[in-house]
Each structure stands twice: as structure tokens, then as C-alpha cells.
């Protein structure tokens, strides 16, 4: 477990909570005590610039890279009047560097095993095992071989690393002929 992950786990400590919050702030992280975080959280690059809204739930085995933001799409509205209720990031999801997940209204759910690409701006819920990218984010593929389920208590079942995409396959002219 990394130092940052250990600090995140201890942010609700009765006596040390405030000190832990300040230590996380030195890393540029804002993880309120109200956030619900499941086991097996992985934070890469010390999470520099990561900000989570207090109404955030992270499932088991979630991976966060640096610069991830989870929050409201209407920050100018007082919290009590906001249509946003919660952001739920389900088990095994990966939020890549600079990903923004912003909820307009109700509950926004990032499906189990979903990957949100670098610098993507996700404003709607996703299904399980999907790959989302772009601004605004749109579905660009699915995680081939990804299946829900966990081993060792917290890490996702490995997948083949391949993905299926909606983009056309390479043309026949771009594929080298097989050697005899």
C-alpha cells in the first residue's frame, strides 16, 4: 500500500483526521472524509491534483491516476439546491490522468470495469466494462476479456489487454502479406 493510499484510509481517524487531510493537501489531493472508498484503491503518481466530491463512492479495486476530478456540473449553485445526488464509481473502474467525472443531476454511475480515458470529460453514466474518451466523453469501445469478479480480495480479474472498438478494422492494403 502506498503512502497516499494509507493516508486516504486514515482520513476519517478521530484524532489524526485533520493532520491526514493536511498531508493529503501537500500532495495536492482533496479527499473529504465523507467519501466512501472500498478496499484495494490504487492511486498512481501520488494522485497529484486529484479532487473528489464529498458525495463520491469508490468501489473495490478502483484505480485513480493524477489529476482526476469527480464533482458537480453546477458548482455555482449551493450544494443544497444542486440536482446532483452522488457519483458512484463501481468496482474495478480506472480513471486515467486528468479524467473529469461531473454529475449534472441524480446519480452518475461509472460502471464496473469501465475505463475513462486521459482528459476525458464524462457527464453521464456508463455500463460495465466500457471505454470512454473525449470531450465530452463518448463510448469508444469495450474491455475485451474483462469480467466482474475479484481475486486476492481486491484486484480485478486480469483481462487480455485487447479492446474492441467501433472504429473500422485496418484495410487489406495496410496488412503485410504472410511469408510463405
Go through each PLM region and give its residues.
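Short, ordered loop/turn segments at secondary-structure junctions
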Residues: 75
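Regulatory activation segment
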Residues: 78-86
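A generic structural signal for short coil/turn motifs at secondary-structure boundaries
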Residues: 78-79, 102-104
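Short hydrophobic/aromatic beta-strand element in the GNAT-like acyltransferase core
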Residues: 49
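Left-handed beta-helix
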Residues: 27, 33, 38-39, 44-45, ...
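Terminal amphipathic alpha-helical/low-complexity segments used for targeting or macromolecular assembly
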Residues: 1-28, 129-130, 135-180
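Short solvent-exposed loop/turn micro-motifs enriched in small/polar/acidic residues
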Residues: 22-24, 34, 80
Amino acid at each position: 500500500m502506498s503512502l497516499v493510499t494509507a493516508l486516504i484510509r486514515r482520513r476519517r481517524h478521530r484524532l489524526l483526521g485533520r493532520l491526514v487531510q493536511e498531508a493529503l493537501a501537500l500532495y495536492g489531493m482533496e479527499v473529504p472524509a465523507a467519501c466512501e472508498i472500498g478496499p484495494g484503491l490504487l492511486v498512481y503518481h501520488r494522485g497529484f491534483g486529484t479532487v473528489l466530491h464529498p458525495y463520491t463512492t469508490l468501489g473495490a479495486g478502483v484505480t485513480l491516476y493524477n489529476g482526476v476530478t469527480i464533482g458537480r456540473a453546477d458548482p455555482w449553485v449551493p450544494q443544497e439546491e444542486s440536482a446532483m445526488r452522488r457519483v458512484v464509481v463501481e468496482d474495478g473502474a480506472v480513471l486515467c490522468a486528468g479524467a473529469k467525472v461531473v454529475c449534472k443531476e441524480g446519480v452518475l454511475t461509472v460502471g464496473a470495469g469501465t475505463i475513462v480515458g486521459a482528459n476525458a470529460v464524462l457527464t453521464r453514466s456508463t455500463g460495465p466494462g466500457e471505454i470512454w474518451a473525449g470531450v465530452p466523453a463518448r463510448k469508444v469501445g469495450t474491455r475485451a476479456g474483462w469480467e466482474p469478479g475479484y481475486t486476492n480480495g481486491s484486484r480485478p480479474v486480469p483481462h487480455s489487454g485487447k479492446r474492441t472498438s467501433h472504429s473500422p478494422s485496418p484495410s487489406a492494403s495496410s496488412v503485410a502479406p504472410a511469408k510463405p
